Amino acid sequence: MKLSYTLPARQRLVEIEDYFTVHASPKAAVRLVDGLLSKALGLLKHPKKGKPVKLLAHRGLGHRSLSAGRFLIVYYVDGEIIHITDFFDTRQHPTRMRG
């Protein structure tokens, strides 16, 4: 298995890092992003660990989400590739979730 990060997921990580750099500290921002990436790596051992995402079911890809603090790591599995589609802040409206 391998991980693949979609462009929207990579953009979201940059947004998260930028926000926390300004509103917390650069060190906290890096620690948060590193933690999210580390949690995503755990999917390589247990790709079905996350819960199904009903909001994205209409896409037919079997999206799942894994909780990481106040964030959800949104992904789907396609063969041997785990596609990370979003790092979603749960304080946002669910319709902003990227799949």
Give the role of each language-model region.
Residues 29, 51-55, 96:
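Short, hydrophobic secondary-structure boundary micro-motifs
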Residues 61, 68-99:
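Enriched for short, Lys/Arg-rich terminal
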Residues 12, 35, 39-42, 65, ...:
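Residue-level recognition of specific faces of alpha-helices
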Residues 1-35:
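Arg/Lys-rich, positively charged N-terminal/basic patches that mediate binding to nucleic acids
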Residues 19-22, 49, 90:
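A short linear boundary/processing microfeature
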Residues 41-67:
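A short, surface-exposed loop/turn module that caps and links secondary-structure elements
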Residues 3-5, 17, 37-39, 43-49, ...:
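Alpha-helical transmembrane segments and membrane-interface helix-loop junctions
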Residues 6-8, 46, 85-90:
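Generic beta-structure capping elements
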